[in-house]
Amino acid sequence: VSAAPLPAGLLPPMRFPRSLLDPLARLPAADDQGLVAVQLEQADGRIRAIHTLAAGSGASLPLALTPLVEPHAHLDKAFSGESFPNPDGTMAGAMAANGREAAERRADGVRRRGEQALERAWRYGLRAIRSHIDSLGPWATPSWEALLELRDRWRGRVELQLVALVPVGHWRTPEGEAFAAWVAGHGGLLGGVLGAPFRSTPADRAALLALLQLAERLGCGVDLHVDESAEEHGRGVALVSDLLRRHRLAVPLTCSHASSMGLLADGPCRRLAEAMAAAAVGVVALPTTNLWLLGKHQRRTPSLRPQAPIRQLQEAGVTVAVGGDNVQDPWFPGGDFDPIGLLRFSLAASHLVPWRRLGLSPFSTAAAQLLGLDWDGVLRQGSPADLLVLGASSWGELLARPPRRRVLRAGRWLEPPLCEEPSPLLAACHG
């Protein structure tokens, strides 16, 4: 539910990250938090102008962003964790519970959970989601039917991209090639898993090359689960980069996870990151699920925590996004499709500081670039009047406590997220 469109005119004053405002606009220098106090003018759901405010006027203004992007999700299994738990929180437990859930997966359940996910994402301030779909087995067809239906239903609100997740070798079979053509014809991407751990055998190399060549022929992108382990450090992303370079393949390619690469020593990590940048390989880091599952020992807290080396990749010129991955399913018990929750988590987990451009871009402009979205998320004259306005006036306030928010889409204010409504569990708790 959303309110009526706002009349043309000025929106309330706000504080924006300078990195999300037109780089060509004549604006005052950002403050020490990277913020600029501005007042936006909108008409017909578009930004008409960006007006500057007097210096020192932003201290009590709300912090605002443009709607953010979720580059890696699994809508087909979201919210299934209560029914198919993984109490030990292990990779083996996740795979076993996922298998039990998949055997009972039906179109109506995927549709219901997917609708729940998109409704929450919409209210929280997400404008696009890329979701992988388990696509080899009897659950594949009903999952695709449900999510294609939801993609159409949510078009214009949350852009939904779909990736076919199968063993990489499946794309070499006649059935796999036919399915790839169907996926590409429906605007999807080809996916697969390298690992975990990935040992890079000759058969693996041949299967991956066949997938990349197939994607190039079909003109579609590839998004792989790569190196999601604490072993064989970076071997999968190294093979991907090498094949793209040697065979001069023009395939939009994303490596999701790249977790074991983070355990490389500085020199090898830097050289691999440079090779990935040269091959135009993008990366989606997934700290929530990776820190929950990888390197886990039942009797001790691990000191080595495999996750993508975001800073080293960025320094080499690799486009890096951060995603939430699994949401309340056997792979991760938390999450809620809340990009601000993910941003707050990543401060401690990945040392990403949002007051710097490269700390914010993985959730905004870099994620939009990896998904190939029409809008990069930067506000300029003519861009969508889409905002995520927070009940915090600084990054410190945002990080201190979960902020309330209001989302503006095409000049209409949305209803607040469901989490901001009083919980019925607390109905009896009053003075």
Q: Over which residues does each language-model region extend?
A:
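N-terminal metal-binding scaffold of metallo-dependent hydrolase/deaminase domains
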Residues: 1-56, 395
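Di-metal (Zn2+ and/or Mg2+/Mn2+) metal-binding site signature of metallo-dependent hydrolases
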Residues: 61-84, 229-230
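Alpha-helical scaffold segments that flank or form the walls of functional sites
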Residues: 63, 81-132, 138-153, 181-184
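Active-site gating loops and adjacent loop-to-helix segments of metal-dependent hydrolytic enzymes
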Residues: 78-110, 186-189, 236-254, 279-283, ...
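Active-site mouth loops of central-metabolism enzymes
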Residues: 97-112, 163-174, 194-202
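Histidine/acidic residue-rich metal-binding segments in metalloenzymes
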Residues: 142-156, 173-256, 260-282, 299-322, ...
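His/Asp/Glu-enriched, well-ordered alpha-helical/loop segment
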Residues: 242-253, 293, 304-390
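C-terminal cap of metal-dependent C-N hydrolases
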Residues: 362, 379-431
